[in-house]
Amino acid sequence: MKPPDRLHFTESDEANRLLATDGLALLIGMLLDQQFPMERAFFGPQLLKDRLGEDLDAERIAAWDLAGLEEIFKGPPAIHRYPASMAKRTQDLCAVLVDEYEGKVSNLWETARDGADLLKRLKALPGFGEGKSRIFVGVLGKRMGVRPEGWEEAAADWPSIADVATFDDVFTLRERKKLMKKAKAESGG
């Protein structure tokens, strides 16, 4: 499978192009996808790139003055609902990429032995728990053509951003998630 030239996770064609062509942007977008609308979370890497004034680079972000990075995240508009904590988490994520993957986000998945190894690597990243890691395995497999053996077993088996093919799907997914949450609450789960 050839990777797409766009991932339709935002209203911005430029941001959608960045997500499809820059693995660090995609990983940061996934990191930001919590307690914040999906389309805004995945627009965050474009805002960050614009404010940094150059392509996203893990080494540069990891070395950035944290107070300065927090200001960049504050905007306006803010890159995330919690700009200070997400600036720190983004910096921590980039530091791990520098320390363990030579600063190349693609090394995270290109050198994974299989889907289980990829999942384990993602879960070790700052801000990536079990659920977010499984969703990202799904994004890589379903949208980007990154399919190490066993990726389907490691990917999320519930509706997620990995299932979004058009921007309208973002709203459909949001409604499905609300219904799932309501059903879970009603069942006492």
Segments and roles (model prediction):
Residues 34-43, 97-103, 144-148:
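Short helix-capping/linker segments at secondary-structure and domain boundaries
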Residues 26, 43, 47, 88-92, ...:
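Amphipathic alpha-helical interaction segments
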Residues 20-23, 38-41, 48, 112-114:
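Short acidic alpha-helix initiation/capping motifs at coil-to-helix transition points
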Residues 27-31:
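Short, aromatic/basic-rich helix-turn unit that serves as a nucleic-acid recognition element
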Residues 1-16, 21, 113-124, 130-189:
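C-terminal accessory module of base-excision DNA glycosylases/AP lyases that mediates lesion recognition
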Residues 14-25, 36-37, 80-85:
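Structural motif
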